Structures are given as structure tokens and as C-alpha cells.
Regions:
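Disordered regulatory segments flanking catalytic cores
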Residues: 1-9
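Extended, non-catalytic structural segments that build the interaction scaffolds
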Residues: 9-30
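Alpha-helical death-domain superfamily interaction modules
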Residues: 15-17, 21-22, 35-105
């Protein structure tokens, strides 16, 4: 299993909040992982289930809705770093996409 050295990824860009355009593009990059991603991002289970019901046959819609719900939840921590950490666990393509998008070494 590959590991990420998060101390080496101490780039100031990681503290930024991802914009909606990036989240839309990301939602089309990642696979069928909306439920797992929502759990990793601490989205309420009822909200995740609501998304799964509302976007039954729309994987990209599920992904984007989970990302949007995460971004609009109260509290801090809606950073690129938090999102990358969750994506490292559930979908490496999304992790690689954010690394490339934000030019993080």
C-alpha cells in the first residue's frame, strides 16, 4: 500500500477552500464512491442517503451533491487538504486530480 507523507505536502495551497468549478470537475473524475466519500468527509448519514435517493441513477450528481453538502456544512476544515485526505482513502483518481489541479508536488 502506498503511503502519503502529509508533512511533505505542507503546501499553503492545501489550506484553501476548493471552488465550485473544481468540485464539479472532480465529481466527474471520481468513480462510484459518493457514499464512502460522504462518510470520510463527515457528511451526516441522512444527508448521504438523501443524495443517494435523489440522484439514484446519476453517479456524477451523487458525487457533486456530496461535495456540495460537505462544503456547506457548518464548521471549519473544508480545505483542499481535508478533501485530498478523504480521496486518498476512497478514490486515488480524485486525489491525483487535485494534486494536478493545484500543482501540489
Amino acid at each position: 500500500m502506498l503511503l502519503v507523507n502529509w508533512t511533505e505536502m505542507d503546501n499553503p495551497k492545501l489550506q484553501n477552500i476548493p471552488d465550485e468549478g473544481t468540485l464539479k470537475a472532480l465529481s466527474k473524475t471520481i468513480g462510484n464512491c459518493a457514499f464512502s466519500l460522504g462518510v470520510e468527509l463527515d457528511v451526516d448519514i441522512a444527508e448521504i442517503e438523501s443524495t443517494m435517493y435523489e440522484f439514484k441513477k446519476d453517479m456524477f450528481g451523487q458525487n457533486f451533491d456530496i461535495l456540495r453538502k460537505w462544503q456547506t456544512m457548518s464548521g471549519g476544515g473544508k480545505t483542499i487538504r481535508t478533501l485530498m485526505h478523504a480521496l486518498w482513502i476512497v478514490d486515488r483518481r480524485g486525489f491525483d486530480f487535485l494534486k494536478k489541479t493545484y500543482k501540489i508536488v
